[in-house]
Swiss-Prot record:
Chain's role: Catalyzes the synthesis of GMP from XMP.
Pathway(s) served: Purine metabolism; GMP biosynthesis; GMP from XMP (L-Gln route): step 1/1
Keywords (A to Z) from UniProt: ATP-binding, Glutamine amidotransferase, GMP biosynthesis, Ligase, Nucleotide-binding, Purine biosynthesis
NCBIfam families: guaA_Cterm, guaA_Nterm, PRK00074.1
Source species: Escherichia coli O139:H28 (strain E24377A / ETEC)
Protein name in the entry: GMP synthase [glutamine-hydrolyzing]
PROSITE patterns for the chain: GATASE_TYPE_1, GMPS_ATP_PPASE
Ranges for domain GMPS ATP-PPase: 208-400
Reactions it catalyzes: XMP + L-glutamine + ATP + H2O = GMP + L-glutamate + AMP + diphosphate + 2 H(+)
Length: 525
C-alpha cells in the first residue's frame, strides 16, 4: 500500500496573475501537493477537494471595479487557513469588511517593508533591522490598488510609507494577506513565508517528493491498466521519456513505444533514443524510419503554420498505422503535464484568466477504442525532470534546451529539404558542442541554429563559393514569455562561426540574432 501523497493539499485560486503557476510550483517545492483552480469555484467543489489551506493569487484586475473577481464566500467559512497575495489580499480585505482604493502611487518593483506587529507568518524572518530593531523585509511589489482599511478583526503586520497595510493578519482565523509577491525570487524571504504558511500554519507534511510521486504513479498505472497492453509515442523529449520510464517500471513489457524518426531531429538523436531506451533501459521500441514520408509531404510548402500542420498530420498517420499493427492494445499513454491541463474551461463565468491549453491528444483511428493513461498530468515540468533523474535518466537529456515539436521543420525557414536539414543538423551540433565546452550551455535558456534559405558569396582558398547562411540564436529568459538575446563573448561567436564555415561544406556565412522577445519570438517560425 503506497502512502497517500495527496493527503495534505493546498488549493490555489487563480485571479489571473502571470505568477500564479509559480505559486503552485513553490508549494510543490515545499513537498506539498496543490492544485490551481479558477477563482469562481463552487462551495461544493472546495468541500470535495478538502484543502488544508487556501491561497488567493494575484491578478490584473481592480477590486474597486463592480464586476471584478471575488473569492467564493465559503473560502472564509471553511475553517482552514487562507493566504491572500496582492489581488488576493485586496479581495480578502474587501469581502471581510475592509476597504480598497486606487493608489496615487503605483508600486511596481523592489520595496522594503517594516514589520510592526508579531505574526506567525513572519516571526523570526527578516532581511535587515531598523535602527530601533524592527525587522525589514525585501519584497517585490506589483500593484496599483491598495488596502486603505483592514477588516476590524485584522491587525497590521507590516507597512511601507506608501502602503500602510503591506501585511495584514487575523491570527485566530489564520487569515493572512500580503501586498507583494512571495513566490518570486526578488522577495528574498518569500519561500520562508510560503513555507511558514503551508508547513506550519496549515500543518502540511512534506509528502510530495520525487520518490513518493514515482511510487504513487506506478501504483496508479497498475490499478488503471492491470495486465492490458499500452502504446506510447516516444519522441525522446522530456515528457514522453519520463512517461516511458514510469510505465516501464509499472508494466514492463506490456508497454510498446513507437519512435517515429521524421528526419527533422537533431544530429544523431534517433540513434541516441534507440540506444538509451532500447539497449540501455530495455524498453520495447518500434522504430519507424519515416524521413522520406515527412519530407515528401512538406515539399513545396513555405508557410510555417502549414508546415506544423503537415508534420502533425503525418505523425498521427504514421503512429496510427503502427498502432493498428499491434494486437490487443487497450491504452494510449501520453506525456500530458499539469500546465497542459490548466485551462479556462474551469471558469463558470468566463471571467477567469485564460491559460491556453494544448492537450497533445493525437487523433487515433475511430476503430481503436483506447483508454488514456497520463501519469504526468499532475506535474509541472520541473517536477517531471526531477522524477526523470530519480528514474535514472541522464541529466544532460532532462535539462536540454527546449526543442520544438515540429523539430527542424520550423528551424529551416521556408521549404524543408533533406539537404537543408543535414546542413542545419551539423551546424547546430557545432554550436551546442562549443557552448558546452565554454561552460555557457547552462547559462543560456535556449540556443539553436536556424537555416536561412538565402545564398551568400564566400571565399575559400583562391576560389569564391556561393553557399547558404545560418543564424545562431541564444536567449536568456525566466518564463519564455519574454526573453533577452544572450550576450555571448565575441571570441566565442567567432570560434563557432569559423568551425561551421570550415567544417560544414555548403554554409558560407554565419550571423547572430540579437532580437529580444518582444518584438521577435524566440523561434523564427
Amino acid at each position: 500500500m503506497t502512502e497517500n501523497i495527496h493527503k495534505h493539499r493546498i488549493l490555489i485560486l487563480d485571479f489571473g496573475s502571470q505568477y500564479t503557476q509559480l505559486v503552485a510550483r513553490r508549494v510543490r517545492e515545499l513537498g506539498v501537493y496543490c492544485e490551481l483552480w479558477a477563482w469562481d469555484v463552487t462551495e461544493a467543489q472546495i468541500r470535495d477537494f478538502n484543502p488544508s489551506g487556501i491561497i488567493l493569487s494575484g491578478g490584473p484586475e481592480s477590486t474597486t471595479e463592480e464586476n471584478s473577481p471575488r473569492a467564493p464566500q465559503y473560502v472564509f467559512e471553511a475553517g482552514v487557513p487562507v493566504f491572500g497575495v496582492c489581488y488576493g489580499m485586496q479581495t480578502m480585505a474587501m469581502q471581510l469588511g475592509g476597504h480598497v482604493e486606487a493608489s496615487n502611487e503605483r508600486e511596481f518593483g523592489y520595496a522594503q517593508v517594516e514589520v510592526v506587529n508579531d505574526s506567525a507568518l513572519v516571526r523570526g524572518i527578516e532581511d535587515a533591522l531598523t535602527a530601533d530593531g524592527k525587522p525589514l523585509l525585501d519584497v517585490w511589489m506589483s500593484h496599483g490598488d491598495k488596502v486603505t482599511a483592514i477588516p476590524s478583526d485584522f491587525v497590521t503586520v507590516a507597512s511601507t510609507e506608501s502602503c500602510p497595510f503591506a501585511i495584514m493578519a487575523n491570527e485566530e482565523k489564520r487569515f493572512y494577506g500580503v501586498q507583494f509577491h512571495p513566490e518570486v525570487t526578488h522577495t528574498r524571504q518569500g519561500m520562508r513565508m510560503l513555507e511558514r504558511f503551508v508547513r506550519d500554519i496549515c500543518q502540511c507534511e512534506a509528502l510530495w517528493t520525487p520518490a513518493k510521486i514515482i511510487d504513487d504513479a506506478v501504483a496508479r498505472i497498475r490499478e488503471q491498466v492491470g495486465d492490458d497492453k499500452v502504446i506510447l509515442g516516444l519522441s525522446g523529449g522530456v515528457d514522453s521519456s519520463v512517461t516511458a520510464m514510469l510505465l516501464h517500471r509499472a508494466i514492463g513489457k506490456n508497454l510498446t513505444c513507437v519512435f517515429v524518426d521524421n528526419g527533422l531531429l537533431r544530429l544523431s538523436e534517433a540513434e541516441q533514443v534507440l540506444d538509451m531506451f532500447g539497449d540501455h533501459f530495455g524498453l520495447n521500441i518500434v522504430h519507424v524510419p519515416a524521413e522520406d514520408r515527412f519530407l515528401s509531404a512538406l515539399a513545396g510548402e513555405n508557410d510555417p503554420e502549414a508546415k506544423r500542420k503537415i508534420i502533425g498530420r503525418v505523425f498521427v498517420e504514421v503512429f496510427d498505422e503502427e498502432a493498428l499493427k499491434l494486437e490487443d492494445v487497450k491504452w494510449l499513454a501520453q506525456g500530458t503535464i499539469y500546465p497542459d491541463v490548466i485551462e479556462s474551461a474551469a471558469s463558470a463565468t468566463g471571467k477567469a484568466h485564460v491559460i491556453k491549453s494544448h492537450h497533445n491528444v493525437g487523433g487515433l483511428p475511430k476503430e481503436m477504442k483506447m483508454g488514456l493513461v497520463e501519469p504526468l498530468k499532475e506535474l509541472f515540468k520541473d517536477e517531471v525532470r526531477k522524477i526523470g533523474l530519480e528514474l535514472g535518466l541522464p541529466y544532460d537529456m532532462l535539462y536540454r534546451h527546449p526543442f520544438p515539436g515540429p523539430g527542424l521543420g520550423v528551424r529551416v525557414l521556408g521549404e524543408v529539404k533533406k539537404e537543408y536539414c543535414d546542413l542545419l543538423r551539423r551546424a547546430d551540433a557545432i554550436f551546442i558542442e562549443e557552448l558546452r565546452k565554454a561552460d555557457l550551455y547552462d547559462k543560456v535558456s535556449q540556443a539553436f541554429t536556424v537555416f536561412l534559405p538565402v545564398r551568400s558569396v564566400g571565399v575559400m582558398g583562391d576560389g569564391r563559393k556561393y553557399d547558404w547562411v545560418v543564424s545562431l540564436r541564444a536567449v536568456e529568459t525566466i518564463d519564455f514569455m519574454t526573453a533577452h538575446w544572450a550576450h555571448l563573448p565575441y571570441d566565442f561567436l567567432g570560434r563557432v562561426s569559423n568551425r561551421i564555415i570550415n567544417e560544414v561544406n555548403g554554409i558560407s556565412r554565419v550571423v547572430y540574432d540579437i532580437s529580444g522577445k518582444p518584438p521577435a519570438t524566440i523561434e523564427w517560425e
